[in-house]
Amino acid sequence: MSRKINDTFDACFWEEYLESQGSRLPPLPDVQRITPRVVRVLAGNPGGFQLQGTNTYLVGSGREKILIDTGQGLPVWIDHIAQVVAENDLKIVAALITHWHGDHTGGVPDLLVHFPHLKSAIYKNQPDRGQQDILDGQVFQVEGATIRALHTPGHAVDHMCFVLEEEQAIFTGDNVLGHGFTVVEDLGAYTNSLGIMNDQGCQIGYPAHGVVITDMPAKMAEYRDQRLRRERQVISALRESRQKNAGRGSITVQEVVQSVHGTVPEDVSKKALEPFMQEVLLKLAGDRKVAFELQGGVKRWFIVGNRV
């Protein structure tokens, strides 16, 4: 399934992400109790972009539960949720949404049909009409679960993660996945959000896609190293251009892609690699490591001074 993350990025391709999809993903059960206070319910929407499907979670050790995310809106998801609630005499008291993408919000209408008491208890940063706002640092509690909200934009402007204090665990949303890497809307904001997530000191990660992350510090280091590797590749391309050409040796984002990746199909470059490299360049510009000049209305990028 292809969907737009921003105005330029068609999320049908991202190199490391799709490489991870080429491997065999471990199967996940439709419903699984992961710990005494966390039950995972798959949304029934497996695919190249959603991995085994969107993970939704029922959280709490008592009768009352907090739901995290609502899947894509497929009937199988609400059927599983309703079955778990009925068989265990549970009550969902609130639903927390990690971000606006349809594979996380699509189940809200079905949820309200089955559980109309939740009409005033759907929480989301930058809420839709009738929903409640989630503030950074806001705390939600049920028996056995204290959930603290973190505003962590980058993958999406409204992205929230949720720390489960009792388990030293974090619901990572789409910021960190159980397999491979995520797509990013704003790399500068995303980099800052990774730092916020890492600072929580959580050991376990419950992602919105993929398996449980059993070593969160190691996973965060993996994500940091991947981002830094991409920055080094871009810097290397700009440095090589400056060495080969007179003046600043400025080059276009298309030329950066060609330097880093070689010759790739035009649609792959336009739809995926160029928007991603543009985000890397903008992040480096924010760090004052690179800048651009306009030539014929086209941005040409170069290294700033001798900073790198």
Curated annotation (Swiss-Prot):
GO BP of this protein: secondary metabolite biosynthetic process
Cofactor binding summary note: Binds 2 Zn(2+) ions per subunit.
CDD domains membership: LACTB2-like_MBL-fold
Active-site residues, record numbering mapped to chain: 103
EC number(s) given by UniProt: 3.1.2.-
Keyword Protein transport in record: no
Coiled-coil annotated spans: none
InterPro entries: LACTB2-like_MBL-fold, Metallo-B-lactamas, RibonucZ/Hydroxyglut_hydro, Sec-metab_biosynth-thioest, WH-like_DNA-bd_sf
Catalytic EC class: hydrolase
Positions that bind Zn(2+) 2: 103-104
Binding, Zn(2+) 1: 99, 101
Pathway in which this enzyme or protein is active: Secondary metabolite biosynthesis
Pfam families: Lactamase_B
Catalytic activity: atrochrysone carboxyl-[ACP] + H2O = atrochrysone carboxylate + holo-[ACP] + H(+)
Reported cofactor(s): Zn(2+)
One annotated GO molecular function: metal ion binding
Keywords: Hydrolase, Metal-binding, Zinc
Family the entry assigns: Belongs to the metallo-beta-lactamase superfamily.
Function of the protein: Atrochrysone carboxyl ACP thioesterase; part of the gene cluster that mediates the biosynthesis of physcion, a natural anthraquinone fungicide that can prevent plant fungal infections. The pathway begins with the polyketide synthase AcPKS that condenses 8 malonyl-CoA units to synthesize atrochrysone thioester which is released from the synthase by the atrochrysone carboxyl ACP thioesterase AcTE that breaks the thioester bond and leads to free atrochrysone carboxylic acid. Spontaneous decarboxylation of atrochrysone carboxylic acid leads to the formation of atrochrysone.
Protein name per its UniProtKB record: Atrochrysone carboxyl ACP thioesterase
Annotated source species: Aspergillus chevalieri (Eurotium chevalieri)
Lineage: Eukaryota, Fungi, Dikarya, Ascomycota, Pezizomycotina
